UniProtKB/Swiss-Prot annotation:
Family: Belongs to the class-I pyridoxal-phosphate-dependent aminotransferase family.
Example GO molecular function: 2-aminoadipate transaminase activity
Name of the molecule in the record: Aromatic amino acid aminotransferase C1773.13
Native source organism of the sequence: Schizosaccharomyces pombe (strain 972 / ATCC 24843)
E.C. numbers: 2.6.1.57
Protein keywords: Aminotransferase, Cytoplasm, Pyridoxal phosphate, Transferase
Protein location: Cytoplasm
């Protein structure tokens, strides 16, 4: 028998505890006991006749035609939204989409996403819910305001998403960095931090922020066994986990040197079984808040995502949103729902498989070039098993100018500026650290998601030329781990 989540109200921040439901949201739920149709003078809604947007037409790939050639698809679906027309099957009322909307999200889209969550994660407690967000960065801020008071300590990976650092710092968060290896966050490091916590610093951290799959910036992916260990530690030390998963569906097979993936496309059920289980799917208590985004799956400009968690957390997040961002864009929700309804659950899985395949090809192509040119005496990296990034460490022992007594972060910035002069842009490792002055290693993050294939080789050549100028290079032969 599936039970409700545990009571985690003691984790709520002072802001969350102080927030009440907005009066206008409650007003909309009040109905006449007689069932009479009400004539409303209550809401200050603009009249639809004065909406300047009257019609919107979109195109998207037709189900079964997801493979693109030079940015075009063999068959596309044309959909038109008209403010005066009655909505057809699979379309939302466009006039209502342009009006002030429900803070949780448009009900039809919320319903589709909930079914998607049931198929993939099958939450193991009864009272879970979702809240539409404006993407994962917005979702993270909601979660922080839900859980964190000014001055609280929050656990993160040693290297983490820079926007998360910025969002936390503005809320007065004190960062506690957990060590990592090529597989991601180390449970042993987390255990040591929590077990040996110095109470003079304040209460032990009760929030952990992690990107478990295709981690940004390292590209690491937590194994199932490690995810279970993290959850066990969360239970032991009463930690709420914020699971940020924009790259979850971009999991990849092993790299073997060939360009095209060996695995052939399969049915939706087989595809879903190939994915490492999420922390949400392993959570039986309701202590995981999962962030999903359509930015990597549909387009970043939709500014749509969703938060999944226990209903108490979601209710309090909704209260924050009601006086902050309110509902996400009704236009974007309408467009997204038209696509997802047309494709259906199986079709959406097929689209996710196409993305997985496409980015695996990109990863393989980039690794082929990196293996060819990057000297293994200086450049150290592991094959990313998901996501969009290759994380390259530079061996400090081979730095030519070690007698200059520069700090690691200074050397890293020196190389970064030299790369810019050579016409190649990567991202410094220190940009992903809450406390870059403590850096002891040089890293650069490469995104293989956006550059043209034909630019991979020239870009890596330029990077290698800078390496040769700053490091003593012994070998160029590499067998990628």
């Amino acid at each position: 028998m599936i039970r409700n989540s545990e009571d985690f109200s003691h984790h709520l921040s002072r802001e969350s505890k102080a927030r009440e439901k907005g009066p206008f949201q409650m007003l909309g739920r009040i109905k006449s006991s007689t069932g009479i149709d009400a004539i409303s003078f209550s809401s200050g809604l603009p009249h639809p006749n004065k909406f300047a947007i009257r019609e919107l037409s979109i195109k998207f790939p037709q189900l079964g035609c997801f493979k693109e050639e030079n940015g075009t698809y063999a068959k596309e679906v044309n959909v038109t939204f008209n403010i005066k027309a009655d909505p057809s099957e699979g379309l939302l009322n466009f006039s209502q989409s342009l009006q002030y909307g429900q803070c949780q999200g448009i009900s039809e889209l919320v319903g589709f996403i909930k079914e998607h969550i049931r198929r993939i994660h099958a939450p193991r407690y009864e009272n879970w819910d979702i809240k539409m967000s404006n993407g994962n960065t917005s979702g993270l801020e909601y979660c922080l305001r839900l859980l964190v008071n000014y001055g609280d300590h929050v656990l993160t990976e040693k290297y983490t998403y820079p926007a998360a650092i910025t969002a936390m710092r503005a809320l007065g968060v004190q960062f506690v960095s957990v060590d990592m290896d090529s597989e991601g966050m180390l449970p042993e490091s987390l255990e040591e931090i929590m077990r040996d916590w110095d109470i003079s610093l304040g209460p032990r951290p009760h929030v952990l922020y992690t990107v478990p799959t295709g981690q940004n910036p390292t590209g690491s992916t937590l194994s199932l066994s490690r995810r279970k260990k993290l959850l066990a530690l969360a239970r032991k030390y009463d930690i709420i986990i914020v699971e940020d998963e924009p790259y979850y569906f971009l999991q990849m097979e092993d790299y073997n040197g060939s360009l095209n993936p060996a695995q052939q496309k399969c049915d939706g059920s087989t595809f879903l079984k190939s994915l490492v289980p999420s922390l949400l799917s392993l959570d039986t208590e309701g202590r995981v808040l999962r962030l999903d985004s359509f930015s990597k799956l549909i387009a970043p400009g939709t500014r749509l995502g969703y938060i999944t968690g226990n209903s108490m957390f979601i209710d309090h997040i909704t209260r924050i949103a009601e006086v902050c961002t309110e509902s996400p864009s009704g236009i974007c929700q309408s467009v997204l729902y038209a696509m997802l309804h047309n494709w259906g659950q199986e079709g959406f899985c097929a689209w996710l498989q196409e993305l997985q395949y496409s980015y695996t090809v990109r990863r393989n192509a980039f690794l082929n070039v990196a293996n060819k040119y990057l000297p293994n005496s200086v450049c150290i990296y592991h094959v990313p098993r998901a996501g969009l990034f290759l994380w390259v460490e530079l061996n400090l022992n081979h730095y030519r100018f070690s007698d200059t007594k520069k700090s690691v972060s200074q050397i890293e910035m020196e190389i970064f500026l030299a790369l810019v002069e050579k016409g190649v842009k990567t991202v410094c490792g220190q940009f992903f650290m809450a406390n870059p002055e403590r850096s002891t290693k040089i890293f650069f993050r490469f995104a293989y998601s956006i550059a043209d294939f034909e630019d991979f080789e020239e870009g890596i050549k330029r990077f290698t030329s800078v390496i040769n100028e700053h490091f003593n290079v012994e070998s160029r032969v590499r067998i990628c781990p």
